């Protein structure tokens, strides 16, 4: 039907439009079908002007025609490239032209209002022009349905991947969201309401006026659109229904269903089934157009399309809440967006006006001046102005502002809905959508919406907004169903009308007034004034603000209103700008957004202010002292999570930051940044008093202390120092405040130190030699970096930070570093690693770091047990040790060495070297001291460092890490121990990376260590005041040993102690002559035969000097012949490395033979008269790795020692050198520059005709080279060059003292020095007289040596005594070898078996006898063979001494005893052992094999002997516990039998009594004397007598003698115990600490017994069996509880009621739930509180989606264990439950209860009618539950006899 009025308007307005904008003439067609959904074709007559093509620069998109007049035509034109201006003003009478921006598609030339719509647009093959206007004024007449026919066949939208067509323009879209976004362009809100009746030109500005016009003029009832947000009126219901379809983007192709909810639309499509899909195309094409209109009769199951068709029912609210956003004022929002775009970006709240930017210090957008509270918000906002290509969707090319939004968008496009509802089939992309679904669909499950909404009529509260709206409809429907009589509201009028028309007529006729109707579409109420109507109209809104008059029906608007806050009574003014407001919410929002950089967060406790709220929260913790963040691996706590994340790196072994220059690796990025300053030369910190510069602030702070005075002073002795750590060390060493600093013993000798760094330096210098330091300017080498620093400062004049020195010597240092980095040219296949000189830092600082040294004394008390354990056992990798000083000092300033204990790790078997070289090609490189040591693979990859040390968390950057370099290849042994351990260390270090980790981290040794720590922690709890220790009198008497401090409560134990264990009753063996004491008879006999001084005096006829030579003397001629024929011994490679590079290699004596040359550092720098004589080198020679003195038997391994010996202390040359033959050694001839040769003779001797004996051939004398500036002289030019290169200590003109190294610039100073220091000095006149022993012929030059000789040889004094037992000896090396039996330190392992030895000689003898089995000495009288000469001597003395009376019948051997003959027969003529009587004869067909090593033995007896000797059963002699290998036994002895150690010295004892005795004898006596230092330490007094002491262990032992004992009481409760471990475990109940963790699950507990009890869960063993029914369980408590089911016993009764139970925990739960009101356990997700933790855990399962209980038959999952047990009965035929009143049976109990209630209602208690078949076995959960498909963890190893 055509509207003539509108057609005439368009016809008349065509010319005006042409004149207005002739360039943009796009003639619209006559709107004959205005208001109808359908495409509009642009047609024009042939005689008229042809329309212009759609220019991309200017495209007419929308045209809205109104019916008021020809001049009110609004044209909306969107211009992309330019702006359009209207024509002449006179031609545009009343015409409005609005120019906005447009986005168009270049392919189909379709335009869009927003770029997002263009991004989701998909072009079709045919050009489709958009509809000009969708919401034009509708008409009330019957509309032809042909205009609504679908254009073309529709694709099946029921398929998941089928496109969705737009119902207006038929454009297809893949995604529903794209269709909905596109559908918005068809909606426009009308500005004028026109009359829908034909021929009527009435229009009104408001809807009410049109409604009154229709009723009064046309007598028609207006039908409003039932869609929310649409204000249009229609003349008939059919027109309204037809229009309402235009509001829904989704239309069903099978029926008239439509909607805007994607989920409901998909569900409706699935309801048609798959059969309708195949007939879709034909059905749509042949579908009559009337099907789209509402029919009178609909098919069954379909309801009339109404508001309910698109609005979900209560409980069906959309997850995305699309209906609430689109159906409620959606057209108003869209039009507002268009208006915003047309008018430009408006200035929103919080934006900064131009010119006022300086007032605000905040996160401000530079483009739109918008402000944000956080920088992250600004960064996300900037993506709007500057799109990030990485945040662009690859499918629709749409840009996003964050990765999370892009991820959500991609998930929506892919249709992946990861969040699923556990109660229904709903799924969503986002978690919030699922929460909204749970709140709307499952009200009682989720508490996502915490708001409540009250009904404005009856004040009833609702949790869901939709429920409130439905409730409001009931009030409206009730008012409409029962209309109340209408009373006249005029004063004095009592008229009452039951009819609405009569009431209106009465008001109009009688009072002349007009009633105001309620604006609500379904409310019939009338009011006298508009104000009363408006007040009533608010009652139709669902949401009312309680603080103001605001009311609305949109929940989101209501929430937005509440967030905006309400004005208060006080005006709030901003302190940074003129802003003022009464609204506190607006004020906080303004300050947070506009002044984010200002310090707006003030501390209420102090004056602290900050710009960040997180910083304020962290600052407030300073006042409270709380540290909420705690490390799970140690006791570290901090205030901020960022500190914790940095601290966690200390527990990690990964070092991700590596320096590319030197290989330095670290865990912290900042450390690497600071380290890189060295390579860049960035010495940013400079001293203001000198030229010192460095790259670290802490180094500068330490340096500045040099220029300051000693500001710190000791209060006790007035000791002054500069650094705090120096004062702390002084107090610890001198005055012992509290616990003294622990002693760090050396692992290889008896050296001890209270400073760990000194110990590490000692071990490196004396024993390990793992790191060697080289001077880059000369050939100086040392094993101490401090000594290297002193060398550079003394010889080369180096000072840290001296720029002049660095500039002059930089090139030399670099050259020396390159030479050191170059690999050795003569490296053989063994690839020996030579130590590399360390590149010294230019800012090298000798002063130790004050921060670390300051921290060390604080941790001494805590770390002392760990350090002691670290001495005894290897540290685990995952344990954090004490601060690694190697990591603290950087660049080689300090050295931290940890010796690897390979023999203490039996689980890591080292690979053989052959397998190691086959499996991985390892390239040995020169060591870099500044980087880690690693192995390089062929691909260039670098393996992790073999040895590194973890650092602990420090508050500031105090140091950088420095990895420790281990020696991988064995060098010529400086120390035999190191040469033996180096290969094993290397193998173990490499295989530690390849061998898989043990299956569980909680080893038995770790648990024992934690138990010991728990015992020691009890003392700390006493000091903290959390535990009170009291002494109580025990029951019974105590028995004390009269000879020692042993005390016991059992008389039998005292008797046993007196017989065997008392050390005081053992009487020593005394020598009758001199009184020396011995423990064994053999020692006494040896002493009386050879060493007793009294017997030696009696038996001495003439004084004969005792020759200390080990070998027998040879005749002189034989000695000379041997000397002439002896070949020069080969030199070790260690001596070869000492040669300088310019030394010639073609020396006499054969290739490869090089003699060690004494360097100037080995000789004392003295004047010529005291320097080394010319013939010094003749007096010693080098043989078999040792330097031998040619005049006596002295030998050593160092060149400096032999030089000092032959120069000063050799006494053999004076009286014995002519009686002793000396071997001949070759001389080394070095060519000089002048062509001569200087013969350096190292002890060569020849027979001279002028001397009968061996004489010394005079050395060929050459020219002496002298230093021009000092008295130094030498015979070789190279030595002089080295002396000058190192730096002469004297300057030209300095004078040198001849008696000491003193130098002076003037002669007067030298004379004064000699007068003071050497007043009686006179030139030496001949040798000093020798001192001679009066008891023997011993002579020496020093009185100290003579005194020591008398004490050792004649007085029997043994100065070296073992601290662990009574062993004493005269030799220190014997003591060290003996102590290794106790400590295990220094033991030399055998490479073929796990045995260890204290000396190399015993190791060699062991290898000869056990492994090689090749005897070297033979008895000449029989077949006996041995491995030492002493074996043959002992055999001859015992078996062949005297007259041989026993002869062998099978050979000619004769013996002096029958026992020797039997041994010979068993050894030489073995016979098979006859079988014993009564035993079957063993038939042995061939040799017997050893099960351990596979050795073939001829007889069982030999096999038993072999097993007893070669594979002994290692058993502890104290506790008879057996071990698989020697290291395990040593570890056991160390841990258990020497576990009592003195805290003041290195003493250790097996039993506590020995330690008590040691304290009484050594420390208590010395501490009883009063002193100033001990005045502050109170004595410990006995509560029963006057005894006092200073050590708690002594007091405990004394109190035990009174029969008393200690009792520990908890201060928080009434718990008390005598056990220290138990009080520690109990205290954790109050603190919540749970250090014991299960390695198979997340279980943690406070004591190890609970952990052991818990570990049975992971085992399948069920060792407790019920004798009645065969029930098996894992715990005895389970069995006890089960037995009560058979006995019916319920011993636990509630004291407050009659409740009884058979379980104590059930009674506890009953009392907590029934008789307590406190609900201490709260759910963090929903806020519900519970009385017990079990109920809370049960409740938490509701929030989780996990269903851990899976049936092993059908794989059905259950959330509860009971559900699985009940379900398991469905797979069986058993019916265990039956009715006692009839024959009914069931599988579950509740079924029988339900049966009794239904069929036996007379039964009072239905549970009494339920019975259970006792023959039916109980369904156990482990029998029906499906186990985890992952491989089970290996069972934990047995921990002892308990299992």
From Swiss-Prot:
Coiled coil: none annotated. It comes from Mus musculus. Residues 318-329 have a biased composition (Acidic residues). Residues 1168-1177 have a biased composition (Polar residues). Belongs to the krueppel C2H2-type zinc-finger protein family. A zinc finger (C2H2-type) spans 103-127, 164-186, 363-385, 391-413, 453-475, 543-566, 601-623, 629-651, 657-679, 685-707, 744-767, 1331-1354, 1388-1411, 1446-1469, 1514-1537, 1608-1630, 1636-1658, 1664-1686, 1692-1715, 1721-1743, 1749-1771. It is found in: Nucleus. GO terms for cellular component: nucleus. Residues 294-357, 819-888, 1103-1177, 1795-1843 are annotated as: Disordered. The modification Phosphoserine is found at residue 354. This is Zinc finger protein 142. Residues 330-340, 837-846 have a biased composition (Basic and acidic residues).
